[in-house]
C-alpha cells in the first residue's frame, strides 16, 4: 500500500515538477540506502525505526537553516548518541537523499521520451572499446590532436545555476544550494574552495551527478560552437541521456552568440574536427593547421575560467602532431604511422607496381605504466621482476591459480586491440611467474623445484594462450579465422577500464 501511494505521489509531483516534497518522504531515503537509514546508523542507533529516521532528517534540515550545527550536538549529544558521535553522518544522510531525488526529473523525462518511440537500443555503444573503431577510421586522416584534461572542481554556485535549466522546483534548488554551501563550509579546514570534490569519497553517487552536470553544460556549449563553426553541420543525433535540455539550451546560445560573438564561428571554422571524451580526459583532433588548434585552446581556457569559474592554464591542453606523438587514452598508447604496401596493377599486357603507404592507427600496451601498476599491487618489483603474492599464500592451490588466471584473462581481454602482442606477453609472464612463486612459497620450496614436482597439466589452463581457445572451441577453424583472432579485436562488452590498467 505504501509503495502504491508512493507511485501516486510521484505521478502527482511530476505534473507540477515538484521535488521538494520528496525530501520528506521516507521511501526516498530507503531507496538511497537500500535497506533504510538503519544501514548507516551506529550500533547505538539500532532501535531507530522509519519514523525516527524521517524525524532526524527534518531536524537536520531545520538545524541547517538555523546555520548552527552546535544546536543539536550540544543539546542532544547525551540523549541521542547519533549526533554527538559522528558529526558528518547527518550530511551523508542528506546528500544521499539529494542524490536520489535530483535524478527523478531526468529519469521521468527519459521514460517519457522513450514511450511510443521505436528506438533501437545499441547496448554495444556503452562499451568504451567502441571508441577505438571510430579512432581507427578518422584519426589516420588527421594531422594534429589536443590532449585535454577537463579542469575541476567547478564552483558550487555554477552547478546550481546549471541545474536550474533542468529542475524547475525553486524550493528544492534553494535547499540544495544552501546544503552545498553549508557542507562546503563545514569541510573548509580540509578543502578551502567550494567544490564538488568534497563528495567524491563521502557520497560518490552525488559527486558523479554534479560532475556529469558540469560536463553536460560544458559539452553542450562546445557542441553548439562546433556545429556553428563546421561546414558540415550535425543533422541528426540519437537519444543523448545527458542532454535532456540540449536543444532548448542551443536556441538560447544561438541568440547569445549571434548578438555578442558574431565572428567566433568564422574564427574557429574547421570541417574536419573530431572530439572524443572518457571521464575527465578528452581529445580534440583536426586536419587543419596548428594555428586553429591554438585558437581552440585559447577559447576553451577562457570558457572554463569565465563561464565556470574554474582555474585552468594552457598547460592542461597539449597540442601534438599525430605522426610524431602518441595519445595516452583509455590506457592505450595510440599513434598514427605509415603502413607501406606494394600493389601490383595489370593493364592489358603491361603490369607495374605501385608503392602505397596509407596511414594507420597503432594501439599498443603501455608497458611501463602497466608494470608500475603490477608493482603497486605486489605482483613484481619496480623493474618488472615477478615476486610472490604474500596475501594469497593461505589460499588453496586451486584458488591461487584461479585468481591469477582471472587477472590474466581480464588484462588480455582489455588489451585485445593491441597492435603489438609482445608487451602483453611480458605482462602474462610476470603474472604466471608470480603465481608459481606464490605457490612455491606456500609449499616452502623454490619455483624451479615446485615446477618439477607438479604435473604439466597442473598449469595447462593457465598457460593456454588466447589463440588456443579458438582451436579448442572450433577444431576445424580456418587459418584465416585464427589469423584474424591473432590481430586486433575490440570487445564491445567492456564498459570500464581494468583496475590494473587504470594508471592515470
Swiss-Prot record:
Highest taxon, organism lineage: Eukaryota
Q: Does the keyword Plastid apply?
A: yes
A cellular component term (GO) from this record?
A: chloroplast
Subcellular location(s): the record lists:
Plastid, Chloroplast
Q: Which GO MF terms are attached to this record? A: RNA binding
Keywords in alphabetical order: Chloroplast, mRNA processing, Plastid, RNA-binding, tRNA processing
* InterPro entries for this protein: Domain_X (IPR024937), Maturase_MatK (IPR002866), Maturase_MatK_N (IPR024942)
One Pfam family in the UniProt entry: Intron_maturas2
Q: Which GO terms describe its biological process?
A: mRNA processing; RNA splicing; tRNA processing
Similarity section:
Belongs to the intron maturase 2 family. MatK subfamily.
Function (record text): Usually encoded in the trnK tRNA gene intron. Probably assists in splicing its own and other chloroplast group II introns.
| HAMAP family referenced in this protein's UniProt entry, alphabetically | MatK (MF_01390)
Full protein name: Maturase K
- The species is Quercus cerris (Turkey oak)
Lineage, uppermost ranks: Eukaryota, Viridiplantae, Streptophyta, Embryophyta, Tracheophyta
Q: Which gene encodes it?
A: matK
